[in-house]
Amino acid sequence: MAESINSLEELGTVAKTEAAAPVHVQKLDAQGRAYATGKRKDAVARVWVKPGTGKITVNDKEFEKYFARPVLQMILQQPIVASNRAGQFDIVATVAGGGLSGQAGAVRHGISKALTDYEPGLRTVLKKGGFLTRDSRVVERKKYGKAKARRSFQFSKR
């Protein structure tokens, strides 16, 4: 049968295995740039961040030319403004897929992730603003027997 234990000292102690919070370190490539990918809807953006004068380039164009609507320009600049780093980084992005709104969101997501790779201290500010979270909303698929994803065909009684 099992041996009886007379006291807790005989049982011994369990080693504490506290999982320490992950330490975020600076991740740079050979040219001193931080790289990240951002996604939104069907758009995928590849973003490089390096210290500079604040120039933002999207697909080899100035971002004001690529995203003509002011709303899209504002979306793109949100993580930079939230982290008070305007005019400190040059950002180069290549984005493909989706429409302009999805592409702007993808570049914003990529900029946020690249900024945290370059400067890990910004992570709390950007996470609180919701810039590091991938927006998982995508278009709902069309179903057969329906006009669109949910809209039914017009019904006629007679």
UniProtKB/Swiss-Prot annotation:
List the keywords (alphabetical). Ribonucleoprotein, Ribosomal protein
In the record, biological process GO terms are:
translation
Lineage: superkingdom: Bacteria
Which Pfam families does the entry link to? Ribosomal_S9
Q: Name one GO molecular function term.
A: RNA binding
- Record GO cellular component, one term: cytosolic small ribosomal subunit
Read off the InterPro entries from this record.
Ribosomal_Su5_D2-typ_SF, Ribosomal_uS9, Ribosomal_uS9_bac/plastid, Ribosomal_uS9_CS, Ribsml_uS5_D2-typ_fold_subgr
Q: Which NCBIfam families match?
A: PRK00132.1 (NF001099)
Family classification: Belongs to the universal ribosomal protein uS9 family.
Q: What is this protein called?
A: Small ribosomal subunit protein uS9
Gene source species: Brucella abortus (strain 2308)
